[in-house]
Amino acid sequence: GSEMCIRDRYSLSILTFGEVIMNKPFIAIEGPIGVGKSSLAHRLSKTFGFYEEKEIVDENPFLSDFYDDIEKWSFQTEMFFLCNRYKQIRDIESLNQGIVSDYHIHKNKIFAKNTLDAKEFDKFSRIFDILTEDIEMPNTIIFLDADLDVLKSRIAQRNRSFESQIEDDYLLTLKKDYLAYYESLKNDGANVIRIDTSQQDFVKNDYDYQNILNLVKPMIGENKDE
């Protein structure tokens, strides 16, 4: 029943994170829509000389329809994202350098849980498990969070037409689910950190960025001080 569903949602966390391989850090940045994942991934990739893995969003042909009618288009939307992210990770597995990604493939299950009915979510989860059973997973995760008003402001600033219809309840649910996922990983001893960015601007403010950098460096085996 619901207990099994909740347990299954987080079952990957135990399998996904082993010991951090310091000679090839693989950082994933996660959090709700508009929190600053891509911006931080870009800065970290420049700082560390890592390959920047960017999530493909605009190319999803179902996305604008999805926000118009979530129930009708959710399965197609989530499957497109899952297959694209699977291919992206496959493409970077042979890289010899560190990687910083603005997503973790597990986000598919977080979003799908909120948009699919029970039958579709079960079907989606089985496909997800098959695709992810043998792919390389991040060994370091940074969870970003921010207050609802901050998220809405940042979403408005980037002016993506299909995001203008996102409702407050949807964002609040994502915030809650990301926090639950973070807690589950933390309890499993994973290499994770959570940063509230409501009062921080790590894009324009170097002091804020340096504070984040000082938290991230020990996670990937680098000295805290430059």
Model features per residue range: what roles?
Residues I110-D177:
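A glycine- and Lys/Arg-enriched "phosphate-lid" helix/loop adjacent to the NTP-binding pocket
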Residues W73, T77-I135:
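Glycine-rich phosphate-binding loop used to anchor ATP phosphates in small-molecule kinases
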Residues L40-A41:
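Post-Walker A alpha-helix
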Residues G1-I6:
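Short, small-residue-biased leader/transition segments that mark boundaries at the very start
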Residues A156-Q165, D169-E226:
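NTP-dependent small-molecule kinase module
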Residues K37:
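Conserved lysine of the Walker
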Residues P32:
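P-loop (Walker A) phosphate-binding loop of NTP-binding proteins
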Residues K46-N84:
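Conserved substrate/cofactor phosphate-moiety recognition/catalytic segment
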